[in-house]
Amino acid sequence: MWKIHNKLLIYILWIMEIRLVSSFTSVMLCGRIPGLTPGQRNMCREMPDALIALGEGHQLGAQECQHQFRGHRWNCSEVWQRNVFAHVIPTASREAAYTYAIASAGAAYAVTAACARGNISTCGCDVRHKATPTGGGTPDEPWKWGGCSADVDFGMRYARRFMDARELERDSRTLMNLHNNRAGRTLVKKMLRTDCKCHGVSGSCVMKTCWKSLPPFRLVGDRLMLKYQKAKTVQAVKGKRGLRLVLSRKKHAGTARAQKPVLDWPKRMELIYLEASPNYCERSLQTGSQGTSGRTCQRTGHGPQSCDLLCCGRGHNTQHIRRTTQCRCQFRWCCEVKCDECDESYEEFTCK
C-alpha cells in the first residue's frame, strides 16, 4: 500500500484545521503551503474545504500511478514526493503525460466525491438529475432520476481552475500539460455510471430510481494507461493565434499542392508528449527516476519486470531466503484456529 509522504500528511492536516478556525487563520494556513501559485492561494482562501478534497485527489493519483507502473523501470514514486501542489515531473515525456492526466483526474474525482458527501459547502448533487415526478425509460422498464447524482461538472471546473493555475508560462510544455490535464478530468466525466435501484412488491421492479455515480478510480487509471500506451508525440508551431501543438506535418499528394503542409491536431482525449522517454536505468532527479538498482525482478518471463529488461543489462543478484510461516491451519470447536509451522525457501532476484 502506498503511504502518504510526510509533507503531504502535514499539509492535509493543516488544511483540515481550516474548518475549525477563523478566516484570519485560514489566510495564514493557505499562505504556508509550499508550491502554490498566487491564484491557487486565493482559491484556498475562498474555499478551504475543497483543498482537502484536492489533497485526497493527489493521494488517489499517486496510488494509481504507482500501481500502473509498479513493474516498470520508471515506477512513478520519486515525483510524488515533492511539493504536493507544484509541478510533478520536469521532463516532457510520455510518463509526464500520464502523471499530469492522472493527477487531474484524481482532483476532479475527489472534488466530485466530496460534493456528493456534503463536504464542500458550495456544491452538492447534480441538480440536472434530481428526483422528478415523471418517469422515463420505456413502459416495460420505467425509471426516474433520484438519489444523489455526482456533480462532476463542478469537480471538473474546480480541478481545471486549480490544476491549470500553475501553468503560468505560455510555452510548449505548458500547452502539453494543459492538454493532458483536460484529458484526465474529461475521462472522469465520460466514465460516469448510471446506477439504479428497483422499487416494487415482493422483489418486483415496478419502477427504478437511477442516479449518476463515479466509477472505481482503478478503472480510470486503467483507461489512462491504455491512452499512455497510445500517446502521441507533438511539436510546437507558431501561428496567427500563437503557439500550438501539432502531431506532425503532412503534405498533400500531387504536384499542385505538394508544398502546402497540413497540420494534424491531437485529439482532445489523447495523451501527448514532447520528448522521448529516457531509459530510466540510472537515478535522476531531473527525470523523476530512482534507477533500477536493487529493484526486485523476475528471472523468467519477458514483461517489463523481467530481470533482462528491468536491470538494463547489468545483470541481477540471487538471494536464497528461508522463512517460517503458518500452514495447515484448522478450525477447532470452539473457538480457536490451530496451525503448524512450515519452513519454506525461495529465491529473490534483484538488479545489480
Curated annotation (Swiss-Prot):
Keywords: Developmental protein, Disulfide bond, Extracellular matrix, Glycoprotein, Lipoprotein, Secreted, Segmentation polarity protein, Signal, Wnt signaling pathway
InterPro entries (alphabetical): Wnt, Wnt_C, Wnt_CS
Location within or outside the cell: Secreted, Extracellular space, Extracellular matrix
Main location: secreted
GO CC terms of this entry: extracellular region; extracellular space
Tissue expression: Dynamic expression pattern during embryogenesis. Expression is predominantly segmented, with expression also seen in the limb primordia and presumptive gonads. In embryonic tracheal cells, expression is close to and dorsal to the tracheal placode.
Covalently lipidated residues, kind O-palmitoleoyl serine: S202
Entry keyword Lipoprotein: yes
Annotated glycan sites: N75, N119
Signal peptide boundaries: 1-23
CDD domains (alphabetical): Wnt_Wnt7
Gene Ontology molecular function: cytokine activity; frizzled binding; signaling receptor binding
Disulfide bonds: C65-C76, C115-C123, C125-C148, C196-C210, C198-C205, C281-C312, C297-C307, C311-C351, C327-C342, C329-C339, C334-C335
GO biological process, alphabetically ordered: axon extension; canonical Wnt signaling pathway; cell fate commitment; germ-line stem-cell niche homeostasis; muscle organ development; neuron differentiation; open tracheal system development; positive regulation of JNK cascade
Family designation: Belongs to the Wnt family.
Primary role: Binds as a ligand to a family of frizzled seven-transmembrane receptors and acts through a cascade of genes on the nucleus. Segment polarity protein. May function in gonadogenesis and limb development. Wg and Wnt2 have a role in the developing trachea and together are responsible for all dorsal trunk formation.
Protein known as: Protein Wnt-2
Gene from which this protein is expressed: Wnt2
